[in-house]
Amino acid sequence: LFGRKQRYFMAVNDISFDVYPGETLGLVGESGCGKSTLARTLLQLIKPLDGQVVFEGSDLTQLPHSAMRRLRQDLQIVFQNPYSALDARMTVGAAIMEPMQIHGKPQSKEAQRQRAAYLLERVGLDANAMHRFPHEFSGGQRQRICIARSLALQPKFIICDESVSALDVSVQA
């Protein structure tokens, strides 16, 4: 067997910023510079080796899993690749309602269905799309579904990881 030394690459180093309610912050950088890694670290999908991620006064890196799970309703992400972001076995409606069911917001199934239909319409899709599966949609339509899903819980903070790259050029602006 041949062995290789494990090498570590510092994707994000010495970064600090504040984002206040109502503000938008854009990160720009070349491919591979760590933008997606930073996004995943902010949401604690990747644990940082050092430093803090503070949201509403709490250091997310120090929170137990149960507390972080409760906070996830306020922290959402729209991933870059809509093809891998949706479960192919779930209808679009089920995918949008899943975070609502996990967090019990709204409480009734009917209210969740109505919210999912409303969100689909808000992103330019017909409410009847709820009964279809992800493979029945184009990449741009799937990305709209992912955007609708990220809005389902009315989060306080949304990270968009190149979320418009899969949308039609006419919609990107």
Range-by-range predicted roles:
Residues 1-173:
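ABC transporter nucleotide-binding domains
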